């Protein structure tokens, strides 16, 4: 990374460069943009980050991010509470919400499993999922993990873990390419995948 001869600015560039999808060049442009109108752009960002740090918490039911300990999705009376979509991270939850085509509940695993690294399945929130399935009388579990090798491995472990529950288990269908991640799909493709989901064997 090219240095600016200012430690504080270099540190800020470094922090931005670690964000997903950003490299050092993009990070430098962002920092320069903020500093060019520091009183408005930078202070607005700082104030917003402080508020987020104070107010945003993880939903104690599904793992979503919200200002309440039970998020607006879990507490909504308009959601179909007999269906749960299991996603890897909040990013996939947001992607499904953008599609506007899923009206059920969610369960955020927080991780995926890599067959190569031999991760322990205990890193997933599967006990909480099984408990919810029984307590909330869930009729269908939609496995909405990514179509990557890690996502497929994770889907297998979810299916094995839920064998003792009678809920129908399905998987997002057509339109998701092998290796594809939900967060990068357009709303139409993701809507089709939800509508055409199939039983997962």
Swiss-Prot record:
GO terms for molecular function: DNA binding; zinc ion binding. Pfam families: RecR_C (PF21175), RecR_HhH (PF21176), RecR_ZnF (PF02132), Toprim_4 (PF13662). Keywords: DNA damage, DNA recombination, DNA repair, Metal-binding, Zinc, Zinc-finger. The keyword Protein transport does not apply. Coiled coil: none annotated. InterPro entries: DNA_Rcmb_RecR (IPR000093), Rcmb_RecR (IPR023627), Rcmb_RecR_Znf (IPR015967), TOPRIM_dom (IPR006171), TOPRIM_RecR (IPR034137). Residues 82-177 form the Toprim domain. GO terms for biological process: DNA recombination; DNA repair. A zinc finger (C4-type) spans 59-74. The keyword Hydrolase does not apply. May play a role in DNA repair. It seems to be involved in an RecBC-independent recombinational process of DNA repair. It may act with RecF and RecO. Belongs to the RecR family. This is Recombination protein RecR. It comes from Rickettsia akari (strain Hartford).
């Amino acid at each position: 990374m090219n240095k600016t001869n200012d430690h504080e600015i270099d540190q800020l560039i470094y922090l931005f460069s670690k964000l997903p999808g950003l490299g050092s060049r993009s990070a430098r442009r962002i920092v320069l943009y903020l500093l060019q109108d520091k009183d408005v752009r930078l202070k607005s960002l700082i104030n917003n980050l402080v508020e987020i740090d104070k107010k945003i918490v993880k939903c104690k039911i599904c793992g979503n991010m919200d200002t309440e300990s039970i998020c607006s999705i879990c507490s909504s009376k308009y959601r179909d509470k007999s269906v749960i979509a299991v996603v890897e991270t909040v990013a996939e939850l947001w992607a499904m919400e953008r599609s506007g085509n899923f009206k059920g509940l969610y369960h955020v695993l927080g991780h995926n499993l890599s067959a190569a690294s031999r991760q322990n399945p205990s890193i997933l929130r599967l006990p909480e999922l099984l408990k919810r399935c029984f307590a909330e009388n869930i009729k269908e579990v939609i496995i909405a993990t990514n179509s990557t090798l890690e996502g497929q491995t994770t889907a297998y472990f979810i299916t094995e873990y839920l064998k003792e529950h009678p809920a129908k288990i399905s998987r997002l269908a057509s339109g998701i390419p092998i290796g594809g991640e939900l967060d990068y799909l357009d709303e139409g493709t993701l809507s089709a995948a939800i509508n055409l989901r199939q039983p997962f064997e």
